[in-house]
Each structure stands twice: as C-alpha cells, then as structure tokens.
Amino acid sequence: CSSDLAVAVYLDAWHRDLPEFLQLRTNNGDDRMKAHDVFPAVCYPDLFWRLAEENIDAPWHLMCPHEILTVKGYALEDYWGTEWEKRYLDCVNDPRIEKRSVTVKDIVRLVLRSAVETGTPFAFNRDSVNHMNPNGHTGMIYCSNLCTEIAQNMAPIEHISTEVHTENGDTIVVTATRPGEFVVCNLASLSLGNLPVEDEAYMERTVETAIRALDNVIDLNFYPLEYARLTNQKYRSIGLGVSGYHHMLAKRGIHWESDEHLAFTDAVFELINYAAVKADTALAREKGRYALFEGSDWQTGAYFEKRDYTSEKWRALAKTVAVQGMRNAYLLAVAPTSSTSILSGTSAGIDPIMKKFFLEEKKGSMLPRVAPELSMDTWWYYKAAHLIDQSWSVRAAGLRQRHIDQAQSMNLYITNDYSMRQVLRLYLEAWRAGVKTIYYVRSKALEVEACESCSS
C-alpha cells in the first residue's frame, strides 16, 4: 500500500531476509542497504509471540519462501493458525531447505531496536486477523495497508496467457489475467467528540447514514484500474471508523487511565458495531447482498459467536442477517484521521492528544493545535500521549477490537526511560488482547519541562 511517495512493505516473521529488512530505515549501517521511504511491517504468527512469552531463547528459523515452494510444493505464506504451524515445522525438519537459524530474542531485539529508533516496523498479527475474518470462506488476509487499519481478503493477479496478433501490419500483444482480489479503501469516520454517543437512536441514525453513503461510493466512484472495480463490486467492502476519541472522553470527564474508560469504550464500540450491522443488513434487503455472502461468518452466525454476542438483541440481529444477508463484506476500520480531524476540530483517530497545545507540521506548514474544547472542565482529562501508561491504551484497543471486523490504527507512545522488556510486554499484551495491528511506536526523549498548568 502506498501514499504520497511512501510505501508499506509487509514481510513474514520467518522470511530469510528479515534481519536486513528490519534495518531498512535505521540510521546506522551501509547506506546502500537503506530505503527511508519504505515503511516496513512484519506479519507475526501466534507461534512467534508464544515463544517470545514462554521461551524467548528458543530457536527461530528463517527460510526462503521460493525455496519452500520449490521443495515442498506449497507456499508457506498461504496458511495461518495451526495449519501454518504444522507446515512451518515440516519445513524446519526438512534438511533440503536451507535455514538461517537465530533465536526469538534476536528477532525481538531487532524489531524493538528499529521500532524505538524509527517507529517501524508496523505489526500485523496474521493469525488473529484471519481467525476473526468474516470472509475466510473465500480467501485469506495476508497483510494490511499503510495505516494498518484495513484487513480484507487478498489474492494476486494471475497470468493466464499471452498471445501475439498482427492487425493491419501492427503487432499486438494480448495478455489475459485472472483479476485476483485488489483491495480498495472506502473510508469515513464518525467524529465521536461531536456526537451524543449515549443516545442509541441518534447513533443508529448517524451510522445508518454513513453506511449508506459509503455503499454509494462503491457504485459512483471512478476506478483507474479495472481490477479495483471488480474487487470492490464483489466484496463491496467499506471501512467506517472514528475520530475524536480522546475528545469524547475528556468531554465526559473520563480519565484515559481508568476502568471507566475501558467500560465506556467497550459500550460505545459495541453500539457502533450493532448499528453498522443493523444498517447493513437493512441495506441488503433494499439493494441486495454482496456476492460472496453465502458461507461467510455473517451467514453462518460465526461472526457473532466469535465475538461472544449473546444478548437477546444480538441473537435477533444474527437471525436477521442470516435471512436478509449483508450489503457489504467488511464494515469497520479505524483510520488515523490525522488531517481530517483538524478540519473537524477534534482529536485524531483513537489516539490521545500529543499535548494540550503544540505546533504541528503539516505539508511544510506549522499549525497551532489546541486540545478540542479545552477548558477548566476538560483540562485535567487531557493527559499527553507520552505521559500515559500505554498498557491502558493496549487494553482499550483490545476491547475495541472485538467490535471492529477489520483493524485500527493504534500507536504506542513511549519515552526513553522505557526498557526493551517493557516495550515487548506491550506487544505481548496487545497480542493476547486480540489486537490485530500496531501502527507506529512513537518514542520521545524525556525532557525537563515546566508544568503546563503552571506555565499557562
């Protein structure tokens, strides 16, 4: 996935070139081996995190995927979960496949060193993603996008044939391809800081409007690539997200580092998800279901079972979905909204604010930023991102993730007093909580600063 001359490249945690890949953006080493406009991301299987938690000195074997395909006749990257683990161990035990053996600790050190120094690699927990994929019956999710919030089925474009013709003296080469699955982001965000999130009826109407608008985008959009149009019309995937998360908490007098925060976010995102599913199945009744609905987790009810939606209203909605279908294959994805949140006068995405007031550089311009609706009533609820205990952010992300069928752009904010062990603990906590992706690790040197309250 690319944007503004940058590209995100995802590599499996067992890939032979992983150590070099993890040093693409670091400041030391051979500059000829650097790619500073590449944003590296790593796809982790559950096995890696289990070993990091239980036996970090365990061996970890890096292999060439092409060699595996040649020797074993299958692509290891085409599997996930227990089937992947079985085939991984099969490859490890096959003497015909060359291994670059290190320890889990070696890889963890490289990952964390790069994360602290450069903010990357992004983390993609592939087994968690695919276990919760509502459309696993038709494919697999291999990676995410540049902002780590998209999680949709992917498949490569396949070459079928090439024919050479001569017409009127001109040579024409005709290439036939199978289109694969070319993921497109159709995104919008709810400005939580400006919405009465406690009003269930109001939220349902708002979400219904957003879902309908995003569905219309699919039909009205211009597609420069035919592959994108075909995939978009087959899955009709959308990504409704949020902005103004910290704004929402501060307006209600909720501290970020509190159990009240966790309970509130769980309730809000369950409401958003319920409203989205309800609106989408109604849209399916009106306009028709997406082409691959049959056999999906939506149709079988597995979507609701995996998320432990057992209340009477959820059970009733699951029955309605099974009968009416769904208009869109994927519904929710929380993007960063770092620019659009400025226009909306709210905080970015699901992030805590950087400071109560600061200067931010955007496209070469310095913009003064003030926490939204900053007043004596909200002042003490706007704690700066780098001062927040990140375990609260991770726990909140885990609660939100249950209600988000795709992923969320979730950043970690650390200072230089964090040890590598503490950062690893955050990754492990996120994995255990079911968080699908981690975006940037935003580090900041500790500075001796005057108290904002006093200096103001």
Language-model-derived ranges and their functions:
Residues 11-14, 21, 63, 124-127, ...:
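Generic beta-strand/beta-sheet core signal
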Residues 1-189, 196-197, 223-227, 276, ...:
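Active-site cavity-forming subdomains of large catalytic enzyme subunits
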Residues 1-7, 179-184, 197-222, 277-281, ...:
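A structural-propensity feature for long, helix-poor, extended segments
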Residues 9-17, 42-43, 65-73, 125-137, ...:
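A glycine-rich phosphate-binding loop feature that marks nucleotide/adenosyl-phosphate handling sites
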Residues 13-17, 211-219, 231-253:
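Core structural elements
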Residues 3-8, 29-31, 89-97, 172, ...:
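Glycine- and acidic
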Residues 206-229, 255-337, 426:
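Internal maturation/activation junctions in enzymes
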Residues 148-152, 214, 218-219, 303, ...:
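Catalytic alpha/beta core of large soluble enzyme barrels
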